[in-house]
Structures are given as C-alpha cells and as structure tokens.
Amino acid sequence: MNDVDIRHLQRCVELATEAVDAGDQPFGSILVSRDGTVLFEDRNRTGGGDATRHPEFAIARWSAEHLTPEERRHAVVYTSGEHCAMCAAAHGLVGLGRIVYATSTPQLSHWMQELGKPSLGITLLRIIDVVPDADVAGPVPDFAEEVRALHARAVS
C-alpha cells in the first residue's frame, strides 16, 4: 500500500459519502489504468430500488464495454468496501486486475450487527471466496471509523 493507493481510496470514501447524502448505501469505487489514469468512478445507487446498482458492478460492465482484455487485466479497482459476491463475480468474469479496498466484508458484517441492521438475506462472502486467485489488498485501518460512521448514517 502506498500514497497513491491511499489517495484513490480517499476518493472512494468521498464517493461513498456522496452516496449516503443521496439516500444510497455508502459505497464508492474507481477504476484506474496501468498508467494511473482514473478511467471510471461511481457510487452506490441502490436507493432507487435496483439492488444491483453497485459501483463495482458498474465498473465491471463499463470495463467490458470500453477496455481490451489486457487493459482490464492491468487495471486496478479501488473501493471503499470489499466487493460483495455479485461484484466479485463480475470482476472475475470480465478479467479485471487488482482490487484495493478500504474496509472489509468482516468489518461490514460486524458493523451491521452493532447497528442492529437486519441481514440482507444473502451470505456475505470475501472476494477470495468468489475469485480465489484475485489480487487483493485491504483493509486499511485508517479508514475504518470514517466508513463505519457512513454506514451508521445510512442505517439511521
């Protein structure tokens, strides 16, 4: 983990904040090319009723339409929270590269229990449970309290 990774993760947390401010769940993600160019960014948009409007899923779809397999393989996805199973599968299926996340699935699960939020009705899996050979880095402890506070805001 280096300063560039931290800067990109901070942008993801900013996008997650925008999501909460808009009534969506606190997740934000960006796609960065091999040369460091931010290619795509998005935030969660599930508040409108479509539970699949995750930023990581949007990145997978965008990259499949706009990047070559080699460009996808060398791109890095930065995200405020570790991918869910749906997004991890999409990531693996389109052949995206490294994933760097600020907070993990176990952290999210713990926070949801603490906040009294009911289960989503699905099993929360780690990225490596879905894409065993995925190149992942995270969580980053410095982001835990800020992201937990966003989840608390979203629940209230």
Task: Give a label for each model feature.
Residues M1-A19, G92-S156:
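Zinc-dependent deaminase
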Residues A22-P26:
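Short, flexible loop/turn motifs enriched in small residues
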Residues F27-S33:
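Short beta-strand scaffold segments in enzyme catalytic cores
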Residues L39-T46:
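Short beta->alpha transition motifs characteristic of CBS
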